[in-house]
Design a protein with these regions (language model features):
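Metal-coordinating catalytic core of metallo-dependent amide/deamination hydrolases
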Residues: 1-69, 73, 77, 108-115, ...
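Cationic, amphipathic, low-complexity alpha-helical segments enriched
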Residues: 250-254, 262-267
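His/Asp/Glu-enriched, well-ordered alpha-helical/loop segment
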Residues: 53-63, 70-93, 97-98, 103-107, ...
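Short helix/loop capping segments that flank catalytic or ligand/cofactor-binding pockets
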Residues: 17, 22-24, 167, 239, ...
Length: 270
């Protein structure tokens, strides 16, 4: 028995597709903006069904990598079958990244009690690439549709996809509040921005819920672990646009354009 308070076995992880920037994610519209061929699903529906069912039988919820909305659609089909077979299941599965989920898909995620874990940092690093090459200038505004997820009642967190980008919850929260490219400074989908309070919930209580640890972590309550961070100021009242934390540095927005800001951050070692 090697499980303890710091090393908990209650989830499995599988991949349903690849990455959008690698042109291997599976998209509903069958091709990329550049004309590149659609990525393939890794499993057929029956195989994924068998995997999820076996995981539940052994006491595991499953986090499922779904970058493209074609992969998200597959998860919705499969979990619906699972719930029709076992409607009283206690297991909560999660779609990871879920970057192009449609309004209809978000509604069904809520209905099936499937959690979502958005790659909040993505637009900061790849927003310009997605606008020009992978999904186009319209669809990029719908990437990481966190405001829509709130509207549909989806429980969700956010992440950095380490080691793709570094673990830094406050930076991920900043990205979710601003949706700004770190290269061009363009904002992609302002109507999908979160408030600071919503972003903080994503990296605290919602994150604990996704891990089935909400009875121990995620909020300051009697009986829960004293697992919290003391910050220099009230995050929900801070200027969410003016600066952010990255690699241990607080980067305050300088005078000039965002390219200069990125260059300054690189000079500081971030």
């Amino acid at each position: 028995q090697i499980e303890n308070d710091r090393f908990i076995f209650n989830h499995a992880k599988i991949l349903a597709d690849g990455s959008i920037q690698g042109y291997t994610a599976n998209l509903l519209n069958k091709e990329y903006y550049s004309g590149a061929r659609n990525g393939k699903l890794i499993y057929d529906d029956d195989t994924m069904f068998d995997i999820l069912k076996e995981c539940e039988e052994h006491g595991y919820s499953v986090s499922i990598h779904t970058n493209g909305n074609g992969a998200t659609e597959q998860v919705l089909r499969v979990v619906k079958r699972l719930r029709e077979e076992n409607p009283t299941s206690i297991y909560r599965h999660t779609v990871e990244h879920v970057q192009l989920a449609t309004e209809n898909q978000l509604s069904r995620l809520h209905e099936l009690n499937i959690g979502a874990n958005f790659f909040a940092n993505h637009l900061y690093y790849w927003g310009d690439v997605h606008a020009e090459y992978t999904v186009g200038p319209y669809e990029v505004k719908r990437m990481e549709p966190m405001r829509s997820a709130v509207n549909h009642g989806v429980r969700f967190g956010m992440h950095s996809d380490d080691p793709i980008t570094e673990v830094n919850p406050l930076f991920s929260a900043w990205c979710a509040c601003n949706r700004k490219s770190g290269i061009s400074g363009k904002v992609y989908g302002e109507d999908q921005c979160l408030t600071a309070d919503e972003a903080m919930r994503c990296i605290t209580l919602n994150a604990a819920w996704l891990l089935h640890l909400e009875d121990r972590l995620g909020s300051i309550e009697t009986g829960k672990w004293a697992d919290f961070t003391v910050l220099a100021e009230e995050v929900t009242e801070a200027d969410t646009e003016g600066g952010h934390c990255q690699t241990g540095h607080v980067l305050v927005r300088p005078q000039g354009n965002s390219q200069e800001a990125v260059q300054q951050s690189h000079q500081q070692g971030s």
